[in-house]
Amino acid sequence: MQIDTKTNTNKTTAQEWKSFAFVVCIALLIRILIMEPFTVPTGSMKATILENDYIFSTKYSYGYSNYSLSFFDFIPLFKGRIFACEPERGDIVVFRPPNDMSVRYIKRLIGLPGDKIQLIDDIIYINDKKIERTEVGTYISEEGRKYLKFKETLPNGRTYFSYKLAPIFGVISDDRYGNTDVFYVPEGKYFFLGDNRDQSNDSRVNLGFVPFENFIAKAQFIWFSTKITWWDNDIGVINLILKLKPWIESVRLNRIFRNLYNTDE
């Protein structure tokens, strides 16, 4: 009996392509609906989140909006949110800033709709009550800058660390945002701060209030972290080989799989 090897090969190839397409579809669905990785390029959440931390975030935590659907966020599919779940104070949220929809921000949620928010001498007041804030030590950044480290507790009991640049020779380097006007958070919008209080473009400054519709995901943990990125400059085989060793050496092993809500330090 003669076997048609060409037909069998075609069937095998077709099955392989179907399997590949199935895997790709599952991966896309996971990214669109369940979990998405993000890279953090700035230090506004330092030292909770550092530059070049790779974050896993859950898409389902707040339900879904047009802005949270990866690859489709440029298409106005619908308004508002579906399967919405209310965010909590202290959540670390990935969102689209209302003044620049081309980028993503990651900040800590401080103020809920209807709240009255103000900072006085770097202390957060929520509805005229100051939150608990205790200095617990210092933090030295990779660039050698010294920060004062504070443990803050929100009204719902959520605790986290915030950081403020330490004075240099007794001179405070930047204290523009430690005392603010009163902010009244509108319905359907939220007030955000960066944990790196002196170096964050947040709701005190240009960001303003963020609509719930702009929320993308809730940040959960750091799955990878490195001090440098090897794709910053020219891409090429030789360049990758030259950068491979320093890139491997720059991996922050102590940050891998770190829970962003763990304050047991």
UniProtKB/Swiss-Prot annotation:
Its EC number is 3.4.21.89. Residues 1-19 are cytoplasmic. InterPro entries: LexA/Signal_pep-like_sf (IPR036286), Pept_S26A_signal_pept_1 (IPR000223), Pept_S26A_signal_pept_1_CS (IPR019758), Pept_S26A_signal_pept_1_Lys-AS (IPR019757), Peptidase_S26 (IPR019533). The chain crosses the membrane at residues 20-40. It is found in: Cell inner membrane. It catalyses: Cleavage of hydrophobic, N-terminal signal or leader sequences from secreted and periplasmic proteins. It is a single-pass type II membrane protein. Residues 41-265 are periplasmic. It is an enzyme of class 3 (hydrolase). GO terms for cellular component: plasma membrane. Pfam families: Peptidase_S26. GO terms for molecular function: serine-type endopeptidase activity. Keywords: Cell inner membrane, Cell membrane, Hydrolase, Membrane, Transmembrane, Transmembrane helix. It comes from the Bacteria. GO terms for biological process: signal peptide processing. The active site is at residues 44, 107. Belongs to the peptidase S26 family. This is Signal peptidase I. It comes from Rickettsia canadensis (strain McKiel).
